[in-house]
Amino acid sequence: MFVIVDLETTGGIYNKEKIIEIGLIKYDGSKVIDTFEKLINPFVKIDPFIEKLTGIKNNELNSSKGFNSYSADIYNFLKNSTIVGHDVKYDYRVLKNELKKNNFILENEFLCTLELMRECYPGLTSYKLKTLSKIFDIKLVKHHRAMDDAKATLELLKLCNE
């Protein structure tokens, strides 16, 4: 079982990042089983650069629940799966830190579609998610929104598993 993960975060100081949006897709290797998508209040004001990049506004986050309200659901969604992401090490680290603060230990294996695409399709000029989506005609409506990026990442996983 795979769970494709994409996070949007506050950015900033290493290990101080907060999740502002999460998109999860549970995939059994042939079909999507379930999805999970939430805006998450980081309880800090997000930088105008992040607002512009993601389109997520501070006022939207202020009316959302904090990560602790979703931590058990997120942990259970991820349980017994391989976590998949594009440049996954960042998302995995941030997610692991947030779950740890809520007494959940994330020890899942993970798979990086950026590295996978480099192996499956060597010699491309760029392996950024947006570029790969254009090259392989993958629908990416709102880049830097968690669920849209997760959906595009799933399509990259499928390309390498064909």
Feature locations, PLM:
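Conserved non-catalytic scaffold segment of RNase H-like nuclease domains
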Residues: 1-108, 122-144
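Short beta-strands and strand-loop turn motifs
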Residues: 5, 111-113, 157
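Short Asp/Glu-rich motifs
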Residues: 70, 118, 152-153
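Active-site phosphate/pyrophosphate-handling residues
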Residues: 93, 115, 151
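Conserved beta-strand -> loop -> alpha-helix junction used to position metal-binding or nucleic-acid-contacting
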Residues: 105-117
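Acidic, divalent-metal-coordinating active-site segment for phosphoryl/phosphodiester hydrolysis
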Residues: 145-158
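Mixed-charge, glycine-rich, non-catalytic linkers/tails in nucleic-acid processing enzymes
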Residues: 160-162
